[in-house]
From Swiss-Prot:
Residue ranges of every copy of the S1-like domain listed in the record: 1-72
Higher taxonomy: Bacteria, Bacillati, Bacillota, Clostridia, Eubacteriales
Cellular compartments per GO CC: cytosol
Source organism (scientific name): Clostridium acetobutylicum (strain ATCC 824 / DSM 792 / JCM 1419 / IAM 19013 / LMG 5710 / NBRC 13948 / NRRL B-527 / VKM B-1787 / 2291 / W)
Major location category of this protein: cytoplasm
Places the protein is found: Cytoplasm
Gene of this entry: infA
Family annotation (Pfam families): eIF-1a
Stated name of the protein: Translation initiation factor IF-1
Amino acid sequence: MSKEDVIEMQGTVLESLPNAMFEVELESGQKILAHISGKLRMNFIRILPGDKVTVELSPYDLTRGRITWRAK
């Protein structure tokens, strides 16, 4: 899957789940499961419930995503 195929959306972290998974509510109101991208994991970026994040969604499965940015 190339970078052009992903869908970027904004959302809020609702809950932290095991194995670095998070429940995220998108601005559209949809709830998805998301994991942390490699760069955030390598740099030990902490993500807590209530944080605003940018999520990349695959066009093939819109219920799962990857957190690529945490807003300040």
